[in-house]
């Protein structure tokens, strides 16, 4: 079996995190998210972590060169030898090129790019329908998983689950991601999957691709 060096793409609410967990559980490879890498580096007070902390404490975005350095360090770790899933990176073509350079130095390359395709209208319905109970903390969906024992006044919508915010996030995702997918399509690495199917069917589609 080839090394499972994967990039997983999907808009917010496409089910990317859920599918990544299934891949991790089945193949025993780590899920690599830039957010997690940053948190660990800051907690461990590494050189790059301390640099990143200055920007995070100031409420600023951590510059690409620091993030790229942290990604390079993470991919060189032993648990990535048999593969990994990149989650939330690369977000743009510049980062995709840097990722290729990092992997080339490690004698690796991205083997497969999986894109979960879900129409925007479905994403909006999935996210804007989410409600959280102020009492129990449980998360519901007004259509797909409606609450039975909760009072309506106890259910709240998160600020970033409003339609206005979701539409903006989708615009950003499409503007950034379309060129990255094109970058990998030229390399013949992209497989697109229908993300509107049943959860288990999507998982099986992914497993068939990975072998």
Curated annotation (Swiss-Prot):
Nucleotide-binding among keywords: yes
Binding positions for ATP per the UniProt entry: 13-18, 130, 139-140, 197
UniProt KW Nucleotide-binding keyword: yes
Xref: SUPFAM superfamilies: P-loop containing nucleoside triphosphate hydrolases
List of residues binding AMP: 34, 39, 60-62, 88-91, 95, 158, 169
GO MF terms held by the record: adenylate kinase activity; ATP binding; nucleoside diphosphate kinase activity
EC number annotated for this UniProt entry: 2.7.4.3
Major subcellular site: cytoplasm
Annotated pathway: Purine metabolism; AMP biosynthesis via salvage pathway; AMP from ADP: step 1/1
Quaternary context: Monomer.
Matches recorded under HAMAP family: Adenylate_kinase_Adk
Name by which UniProt lists this protein: Adenylate kinase
Gene for this chain: adk
